[in-house]
Amino acid sequence: MSQRQQRVADLIHQQLAELLKKEVRDSRLSKISLTAVSISPDLKQAKVFYSLLENQNEKEVQKALNKATGYLRHLLAQATVLRYVPKLEFVYDESIERAHRISLLIERALKKDDSDESS
């Protein structure tokens, strides 16, 4: 990713996080966290990765984000000085959930080793 792509991705990440917190009134979107933004080389498309902060229905949140995409893009255009505001695509980030599962598996394996050694 070029420096320009990174700067634009960081700007979009920061602005979208702020807009979701202050401007969007959909309760399904109040408990999400934006984890990363990846932008195409031509700066016309951005993938916005998000995770859920609480146990929520991921499909419902995705539906709400898809519905709010046009509005968020409009707000982003007003909040930034970008010549072209990229098309937004929201993608559920499973990496945090995966890391948590791996951590639990490691803990179980360590506990099993401890119980095997003490026997």
Swiss-Prot record:
GO terms for molecular function: ribosomal small subunit binding. It comes from the Bacteria. GO terms for cellular component: cytosol. One of its GO terms (biological process) is maturation of SSU-rRNA. The keyword Cytoplasm applies. PANTHER family: RIBOSOME-BINDING FACTOR A, CHLOROPLASTIC-RELATED. Monomer. Binds 30S ribosomal subunits, but not 50S ribosomal subunits or 70S ribosomes. This is Ribosome-binding factor A. It comes from Coxiella burnetii (strain RSA 493 / Nine Mile phase I). The gene is rbfA.
